[in-house]
């Protein structure tokens, strides 16, 4: 990675456990009937959307033209039993990014309280509904990783991690559906900075690294 060398992008665990889960669902669907078959079909659609979303993010990272290590689909568990399935951990020279991928259908509005409201269009009608905040999910994963890092360090390093974790670990929520329109006009600044579209991911990473 010296002068004039090509940026190196290392992808670890590029395969996705979701694909194995999807294959099992498809096998179960063939054996099911009635309401159960319909429920499995909905789960298949959600799983397929998640896989496509993560593939979109992986594509962006592979073409980032910067040095990084990408850990894909990582499960972390603390001694106390808290667990977190993190879509991507992106390690750069200065910052480690925790990326939560959301391939949501419909348009997303984020209000001043941080609530997420989704609008889905059905022909000439539209339906609004609140959805679970991906910020909350991302923050929970962030705290689990922080606790796990402290647990696996000696007491001195653990203290340093406790008070400096936020300087080196940054959570991001990436909306991977290119058709999704995000209205964050009334969202707080920190939420606007944390929730981005997939096509903004690389630029956001480069900007945060440059200003760290």
Put a short name on every predicted segment:
Residues 1-84, 95, 121-212:
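Surface-exposed interaction regions that form or flank ligand-binding interfaces
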Residues 90-119:
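Active-site beta-strand-loop-beta-strand hairpin of nuclease catalytic cores
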Residues 87:
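Cell-envelope/extracellular polymer assembly enzymes that use nucleotide-activated donors
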């Amino acid at each position: 990675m010296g002068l004039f060398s090509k940026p190196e992008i290392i992808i670890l665990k590029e395969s996705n456990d979701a694909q194995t889960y999807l294959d099992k669902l498809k096998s179960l669907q063939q054996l099911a009937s009635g309401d159960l078959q319909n429920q499995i079909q909905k789960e298949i659609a959600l799983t397929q959307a998640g896989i496509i979303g993560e593939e979109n993010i992986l594509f962006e990272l592979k073409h980032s033209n910067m040095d990084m290590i990408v850990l894909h689909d990582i499960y972390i568990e603390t001694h106390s039993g808290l667990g977190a399935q993190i879509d991507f951990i992106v390690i750069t020279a200065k910052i480690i990014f925790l990326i939560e991928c959301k391939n949501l259908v419909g348009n997303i509005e984020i209000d001043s309280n941080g609530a997420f409201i989704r609008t889905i269009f059905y022909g000439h009608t539209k339906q609004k509904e609140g959805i679970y905040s991906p910020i909350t999910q991302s923050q929970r994963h962030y705290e689990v990783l922080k606790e796990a890092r402290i647990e696996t360090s000696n007491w001195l390093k653990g203290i340093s991690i406790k008070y400096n974790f936020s300087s080196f670990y940054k959570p991001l929520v990436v909306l991977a559906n290119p058709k999704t329109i995000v209205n964050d006009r009334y969202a707080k600044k920190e939420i606007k900075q944390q929730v981005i579209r997939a096509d903004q991911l690389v630029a956001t990473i480069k900007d945060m690294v440059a200003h760290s």
